[in-house]
């Protein structure tokens, strides 16, 4: 009996997305998904617009900015302010009685991507 397997080596099609720069990092954002960014100075349920869009992909093709895509923006809705997981930092000097233990929790903002627009026209 012969067995057939259907495996694809190519990555699945992700549809519309944008790569944006926020808080010194680059994020791959898709419409109607939520993401955790570094703490934003915005109230819960407020709308935040990111204009530092590096790349936009939609059904018509891919637009790459040099460095940013002209007239492109991503609208985000602030869902909640939260804190990340605790990270323990432990420093010790060998053969001395010096030990220091610190904990850190990053302040985060959970956002939902409302829309991605290029040239004033929403593509998502």
UniProtKB/Swiss-Prot annotation:
InterPro entries for this protein: bL21-like, bL21-like_sf, Ribosomal_bL21, Ribosomal_bL21_CS
GO cellular component terms listed in the entry, alphabetical order: cytoplasm; ribonucleoprotein complex; ribosome
GO BP, sorted A to Z: translation
Domain of life per record: Bacteria
Keywords (A to Z) from UniProt: Ribonucleoprotein, Ribosomal protein, RNA-binding, rRNA-binding
Molecular function, one GO term: structural constituent of ribosome
Record bears the keyword ATP-binding: no
Main function: This protein binds to 23S rRNA in the presence of protein L20.
Membership in a protein family: Belongs to the bacterial ribosomal protein bL21 family.
Self-association state and partner proteins as the record states: Part of the 50S ribosomal subunit. Contacts protein L20.
Name this polypeptide is given: Large ribosomal subunit protein bL21
Organism annotation: Synechococcus sp. (strain WH7803)
Lineage: Bacteria, Bacillati, Cyanobacteriota, Cyanophyceae, Synechococcales
């Amino acid at each position: 009996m012969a067995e057939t397997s259907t495996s694809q080596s190519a990555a699945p099609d992700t549809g519309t997305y944008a790569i944006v720069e926020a808080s010194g990092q680059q994020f791959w954002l898709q419409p109607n998904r939520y993401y955790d960014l570094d703490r934003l100075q915005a109230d819960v349920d407020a709308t935040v617009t990111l204009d530092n869009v590096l790349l936009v992909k939609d059904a018509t093709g891919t637009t790459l900015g040099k460095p940013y895509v002209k007239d492109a923006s991503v609208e985000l809705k602030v869902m909640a302010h939260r804190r990340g997981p605790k990270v323990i930092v432990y420093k010790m000097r060998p053969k001395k009685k010096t030990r220091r233990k610190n904990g850190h929790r990053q302040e985060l903002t959970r956002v939902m991507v409302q829309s991605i627009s290029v040239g004033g026209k929403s593509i998502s």
